[in-house]
Amino acid sequence: MGIMELARIDLSRDDLDKRIGGGIPHGSLIIIEGEESTGKSVLCQRLAYGFLQNRYSVTYVSTQLTTLEFIKQMNSLNYSINKKLLSGALLYIPVYPLIADNKKKDGFLKKVMETRAFYEKDVIIFDSISALIANDASEVNVDDLMAFFKRITALKKIIICTVNPKELPESVLTIIRTSATMLIRTELFTFGGDLKNLAKILKYNMAPGSYQKNIVFRVEPKIGIAVEIASVA
């Protein structure tokens, strides 16, 4: 093993890359776990934009937003991705309409695994994988899904999945957490009267260097994620 290859996510406006050890190792399977509105999606959006700005290609599968809503959301954070969508560097796949009608679908995850175009990019993001698993009517074996993700990351690709723990049984969560090379938990907390987001790095198997275990951030219009110095015990 030579020096670990890192995918760069640096942006001049924040120092998130330094907080996580300088970049994201190729071959990472990152799980961002947290309840509703704790900052999982915005963290994915920041990472996606960071990868794109550093010339990596990204597939973004969303159970949350239509394409237009995603473009608006990214623009509101000043993470403009219009050109990246047009050039094909960013492939955005909204599966929201499929989930919105509340009917469980057969073979939902099978389709996710069989759509080759998703995995042609350098980075593949599923926001959220828990919604995809919870909305699949067929007997999906999450072990199989994680084994499949491992085969993809073995090709030096990076997969990032968000998980709302309320959507899945503990047995499934355990499989997902165990499979992750990096596990981040997002939380909300109050600090000096302000609501802040906290990203706790609980596991980082391939950490390239020293990293900050507790990253405090807030979401600001036109700035995106603003990482704070504030430390949390």
Swiss-Prot record:
Q: Which GO terms describe its cellular component?
A: archaeal-type flagellum
What InterPro entries does the entry give? AAA+_ATPase (IPR003593), ArlH (IPR056568), KaiC-like_dom (IPR014774), P-loop_NTPase (IPR027417)
> Which key words are in the record?
Archaeal flagellum, ATP-binding, Magnesium, Metal-binding, Nucleotide-binding
Query: Can you tell which superkingdom this protein's organism belongs to?
Result: Archaea
Which is an annotated Pfam family here? ATPase
Cysteine-cysteine disulfides: none
Record flagged with keyword Magnesium: yes
**What Gene3D superfamilies does the annotation carry?**
P-loop containing nucleotide triphosphate hydrolases
Where along the chain is Mg(2+) bound?
A: 41
Q: Which GO terms describe its molecular function?
A: ATP binding; ATP hydrolysis activity; metal ion binding
Quote the record's binding site residues for ATP. Answer: 38, 40-42, 64, 196
**SUPFAM superfamilies, sorted:** P-loop containing nucleoside triphosphate hydrolases
The principal localisation class reads other
Question: Can you say where in the cell this protein is located?
Answer: Archaeal flagellum
Q: What sections of the protein cross the membrane? A: none
Q: Which family does it belong to?
A: Belongs to the FlaH family.
* Biological role stated in the UniProt entry: Component of the archaellum.
Q: What is this protein called?
A: Archaeal flagellar ATP-binding protein FlaH
Organism equals: Methanocaldococcus jannaschii (strain ATCC 43067 / DSM 2661 / JAL-1 / JCM 10045 / NBRC 100440) (Methanococcus jannaschii)
